[in-house]
A protein has these predicted regions:
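Structural flexibility/helix-modulation signal
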Residues: 227-229, 233
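Short, small/polar-rich motifs associated with maturation and membrane association
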Residues: 141, 170-172, 238, 242, ...
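Short coil/turn segments at secondary-structure boundaries
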Residues: 188-190, 224-227
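Alpha-helix N-cap recognition
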Residues: 218-221, 225, 249
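Extracellular/periplasmic, surface-exposed regions of secreted and cell-surface proteins
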Residues: 1-212
Length: 249
């Protein structure tokens, strides 16, 4: 299958402009750059069986009976090897990057800063995974791969470097960097929850839900008080509390 993914970039070397004359004594390079483009991915999984998920195939199986031969052995037939999706297409992402590069003192001090934004859509996903809308087990096959899902990711990246010599035989280069990024699931084809906070849409990828620590049970008197709550079922649903146990909010 074919796809077209255009992209482009521009740059402005500010240090070469006339108004920067005289700065070359301390400024080696100053460049502003930006790029924007559409990229595609056809990676579905690490399994070779999924490489052609848009094509239906069949395989031999003994799940269907077509009678027996003269020796009493059953004839095996064909069964669906997968449920294909002929409309499956590329997973796409629109990417924006804006950056600034600078170097000083004959390239000894370098600096780079970037802002990046990615809007990923038509995400290839299998509805049978996790809490997505899939087929019931009685079907005997996983739901087909589809293009469903939108995720935004953005962040900043900084790095600064210094290089120099110690004597004639030793050269060093120091280059620390800092990156901060946040993603957000804008849409996921998932089941409906009675408790909306369990939904993945609107949250970060692989965001975990955990109980928040409040305090430890001080003594038996407090434990008895907590265990008597909610009509005797206890403050927490997973068993009685004892001195030293954790109490969650």
């Amino acid at each position: 299958r074919y796809g077209t993914f255009p992209a482009g970039s521009i740059g402005w070397v500010i240090s070469r402009e006339r108004f920067m004359q005289g700065a070359e004594k301390w400024l080696s390079n100053l460049k502003l750059r930006a790029s924007y483009g559409l990229v595609g991915s056809d990676k579905i999984s690490d399994s070779n069986d999924d490489r052609f998920a848009y094509l239906q195939f069949f395989q031999g199986g003994d799940g269907y009976s077509f009678g027996v031969n003269e020796f009493g052995n059953g004839y095996s037939g064909l069964k669906e090897g997968n449920f294909a999706n002929p409309n499956l297409t590329w997973e796409k992402a629109r990417k924006l990057n804006v950056g600034l590069d600078a170097s000083f003192f004959n390239e000894r001090l370098t600096f780079s800063a970037d802002y990046f934004f990615e809007h990923r859509y038509d995400i290839i996903t299998n509805l049978s995974d996790g809490n997505k809308l899939g087929y019931p087990g009685i079907v005997g096959k996983d739901a087909p791969f589809i293009n469903s899902g939108i995720v935004d990711n953005q962040g900043i990246d900084f790095e600064i470097g210094w290089n120099g010599n110690i004597g004639e035989d030793f050269r060093y280069y120091i280059k620390p960097n800092f990156t901060f990024a946040r993603n957000k699931i804008k849409f996921m084809n998932e089941v409906s929850y009675e408790n909306e906070w369990r939904a993945n849409t609107g949250k970060r990828i692989d965001e975990y839900f955990v109980y928040e620590f409040d305090h430890f049970v001080y003594d038996q008197a407090e434990a008895d008080k907590l265990n008597a709550m909610n009509g005797g079922t206890g403050f927490q649903p997973w068993g009685k509390l004892y001195p030293g146990d954790v109490v969650y909010k």
